[in-house]
C-alpha cells in the first residue's frame, strides 16, 4: 500500500541492557531514515564489471527536535541528566550602593571575590582586579563609589535543576529506539501508525544551535542484532 506521511509523533530511546528510558522527543522535524549497502565490483581482465557482491548493509535515522532536549544531549555525550548542589563561577554586573556594597545574585562559596571596575558602557576599564569581601550575600568594595558599576567574579553554590556533564572518556550507550509516525491511507484518509524500531547508538558528533529557532539535531547509527537474526530495522504499520 501507499501512504501519505502526516508527521513523526515521537522518538524514544531506551537502554538496550536495562530498559531505562534515555530520551523522549515529541517535537520532531526533518526526520529521515536512510539505508546503505557496501558493495564490491567483480571485474574481468578488461576491467568490465561482471558482478556486484554485497558485503554489508547499514541504516541511519536522523532528525531534529524543535526544542533543546537535555535527555538527547546527555545521550549524545555519553552522560546522564542529574540534579542537586553544584559549583559554578558567577559573573555579576552590579551597581554599588552606600559603603561600596551590592547584593550578589547567588550564594557565594567562601568570602573571596575579584572585582573589576566597569565603564558606563559596560566595558572593563582595566584588566587589574581588586579584592572584595563577601558577607551575608553582599560584596563590599573598598573605596567603592555609590552608583558605579563593577564586575564581580566569585564561586557560587547553586541547586541545579538539571546538569549534564560531558567527559572525554565517556562512551555512548547502545539503545533501542522507536519512532512513531502518523500516516494516512490515500483513498479514504484513514489513519495508520508506523513504528520504526531500531537498535544502535546516537552519534557523539552533536551540535546545539543556540538561537531562538535553533533545532536540536541527533543521529542514530543502527547496528544489527549480531547474536540474533542480523536485523537492522523493523517498520511496523497498523491501522489507527
Q: Where in the sequence are the language-model features?
A:
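Extended beta-strand solenoid/passenger and fiber regions
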Residues: 70-130, 155-191
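Solvent-exposed edge beta-strands and adjacent loop segments
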Residues: 1-76, 124-131, 193-217
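Mixed-charge, glycine-accented linear interaction segment located at domain edges/termini
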Residues: 141-144, 191-240
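Extracellular Ig-like/FN3 beta-sandwich strand-entry sites
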Residues: 58, 145-149, 174-176
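Small/polar beta-strand repeat architecture
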Residues: 142-162
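Beta-strand elements of well-folded, non-transmembrane domains
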Residues: 15, 65-69, 156-158, 181-187, ...
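Beta-strand secondary-structure signal
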Residues: 60-64, 151, 178-180, 217-221
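Short strand-edge motifs at loop-to-beta-strand transitions and within beta-strands
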Residues: 137-139
